[in-house]
């Protein structure tokens, strides 16, 4: 089994009694409670999502390969790069939203989708103990609709129409692939031993999120470097204060404090 790092980021500013009781990692009271909320129903949803998603990926990939033409190569390369960039931004937007707003107590989305983000900040190594289904189930669910739409086009459009759409569909497919594997890439960024050589090379070349790069996010209060697909956009977004400005705007409009629920779980001691 691949090894993982064992660091929590900087300690939160708790009073002395709380700090003495609080333990980071799997033994943290909040981490144990959040892990216990992972239900059989959630597991079933993940299994169904993964099976459907990868079936559609295989179907669509075969059709894209059959339609491939050399003259489309420049546009396909451009689409691959654009897909990776947009997937990185979307990963940051979702990550920032789930980290910063909402609550585990929210109906439906709380336990199903926000819970893993709260657990991850308390126990960053938990993701390395998740199997392929738990790691990728939610992302597979999100990409089902665009995959179904693409499959529908391949089944209903004429070959001539598909040739015209080919560069666009390659862009969409690349965006879907990066989106589907974002949490797997995220898991690899927390795994420090036993990764396949090809994964570490992609990390070293910064094709996917590097391990050291992602550690910046895991410094409490987890308010920066949210993009977790390639990580390409983290520095420029931080440089212009994108997330901070967005948080200030939302707080000004709603009065809600960023990361209030995240901090509540981090401070839980029993």
Curated annotation (Swiss-Prot):
Effect of residue 222 to A: No effect on desaturase plasmanylethanolamine activity
Description of its domains: Histidine box-1 and -2 together with other histidine residues are essential for catalytic activity.
Pfam families: Lipid_desat
Example GO biological process: fatty acid metabolic process
Domain of life: Eukaryota
Organism: Homo sapiens (Human)
Outcome reported for the amino acid change (mutating residue 121 to A): Loss of plasmanylethanolamine desaturase activity
Chief site of localization: endoplasmic reticulum
Transmembrane segments: 47-67, 74-94, 161-181
Lineage of the species this protein comes from: Eukaryota, Metazoa, Chordata, Craniata, Vertebrata
Subcellular locations according to the entry: Endoplasmic reticulum membrane
Protein name, per record: Plasmanylethanolamine desaturase 1
Gene behind the chain: PEDS1
GO cellular component terms, semicolon-separated: endoplasmic reticulum; endoplasmic reticulum membrane
């Amino acid at each position: 089994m691949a090894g993982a790092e064992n660091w929590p980021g900087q300690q939160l500013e708790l009073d002395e009694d709380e700090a003495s009781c609080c333990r980071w990692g799997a033994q943290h009271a909040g981490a144990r409670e959040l892990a216990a909320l992972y239900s059989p129903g959630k597991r079933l949803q993940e299994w169904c999502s993964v099976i459907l998603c990868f079936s559609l990926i295989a179907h669509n990939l075969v059709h894209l390969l059959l339609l491939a033409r050399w003259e489309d190569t420049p546009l396909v390369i451009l689409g691959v790069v654009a897909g990776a960039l947009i997937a990185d931004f979307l990963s940051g937007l979702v990550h920032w939203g789930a980290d910063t707003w909402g609550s585990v107590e929210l109906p439906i989305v709380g336990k199903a989708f926000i819970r893993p983000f709260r657990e991850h900040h308390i126990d960053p190594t938990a993701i390395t103990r998740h199997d392929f289904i738990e790691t990728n189930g939610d992302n597979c669910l999100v990409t089902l609709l665009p995959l179904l739409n693409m499959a529908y086009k391949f089944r209903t459009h004429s070959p001539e129409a598909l040739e015209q759409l080919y560069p666009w569909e390659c862009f969409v497919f690349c965006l879907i692939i990066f989106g589907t594997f974002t949490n797997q890439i995220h898991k690899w960024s927390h795994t420090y031993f036993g990764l396949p050589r090809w994964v570490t090379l992609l990390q070293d070349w910064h094709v996917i999120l590097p391990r050291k790069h992602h550690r910046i996010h895991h410094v409490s209060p987890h308010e920066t470097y949210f993009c977790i697909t390639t990580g390409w956009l983290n520095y420029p977004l931080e440089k212009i204060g994108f997330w901070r400005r967005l948080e200030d705007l939302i707080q000004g409009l709603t009065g809600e404090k960023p990361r209030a629920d995240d901090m509540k779980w981090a401070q839980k001691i029993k």
